[in-house]
Design a protein with these regions (language model features):
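Bacterial N-terminal signal peptides
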Residues: 6-16
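N-terminal secretory signal peptides that target proteins for export/translocation
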Residues: 1-2
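A "functional boundary" signal
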Residues: 16-259
Length: 259
């Protein structure tokens, strides 16, 4: 469910050209709202750069491995949605300091974060090396959810790049296996996980209901707003509700610009 602002804006332009006006009720954003945010984008970019600069200063001046780990964690979070090369660099650094500190949780999360970046950039062999080298039994419930989700994403990527029908079938079988492992976990799943599973079953109405639970609790200042709105838009795309697809693309674009 990762996306770039450029993709959102290009997609939205295409939709507008395809026909129809956007919905303009009081609670729904319009193109004018998006234009206002775009005009103020320099302000948001400046704020983001200031925050990153401040954390980088903390990292440079940190004296202890614990402080280096903390700053690396913050910088990874800042970069993971926008600059994967920088996110990768700080994921490696937080893994380095976590190992020095014998911090199991940060070590595992760092390896999972690196595998996630490899998945997103199509480096599936390296992602598999990391995931297959991890033992999931000692993991916390959140770690296991992340782990199973990454394995599912890995095999989805391999399925899409398969050359033969046999490879496609086998990768799809493995994707479903990890999807089911995620679904069958006894611990409560997030609305995001539930929606992704429901979409894989073509249960789009149920998926929208799950995501609406998260959406109604978010504002434009929440980083997750962009992801949730984009996911809702993508569901509407799949069921050919173009007006609502456009509406949530605008919301996603505004949230991304503000964060």
């Amino acid at each position: 469910m990762t996306k770039s602002l450029t993709f959102i804006l290009l997609s939205f332009h295409t939709l507008c050209c395809m026909g129809g006006n956007t919905i303009t009720t009081a609670k729904q954003p319009t193109l004018d709202d998006l234009d206002k945010v775009i005009s103020a984008s320099k302000e948001y970019t400046k704020k983001y750069e200031q925050e990153v600069g401040y954390i980088k200063s903390k990292y440079v001046h940190a004296k202890s491995a614990q402080d280096k780990l903390s700053a690396s964690r913050e910088l990874f979070t800042k970069y993971k949605s926008f600059k994967l090369d920088s996110a990768y660099a700080y994921a490696e650094r937080k893994l380095h300091y976590a190992r020095i500190l014998h911090n199991y949780e940060d070590s595992v999360y760092s390896e999972l974060d690196i595998a996630d970046i490899f998945n997103k950039t199509g480096i599936y062999v390296e992602s598999y090396k990391i995931l297959s080298g991890l033992e999931h039994k000692p993991m916390s419930a959140d770690m296991r959810r992340y782990y199973f989700s990454l394995y599912g994403n890995l095999y989805e990527g391999l399925r899409e790049t398969s050359i033969t029908a046999y490879q496609r079938t086998e990768n799809e079988r493995r994707r479903i296996m990890f999807r089911d492992s995620l679904k069958n976990m006894k611990n409560k799943q997030s609305d995001w996980d539930k929606a992704e599973f429901l979409c894989s079953q073509n249960k789009y109405t149920d998926a929208l209901h799950c995501l609406s639970n998260s959406f109604k609790n978010l504002s434009y200042e929440d980083r997750d707003m962009g992801y949730v709105a984009f996911s809702i838009s993508d569901i509407y795309r799949q069921i050919n509700e173009t007006d609502k697809e456009k509406q949530y693309l605008i919301i996603s674009a505004i949230a991304d610009l503000k964060n």
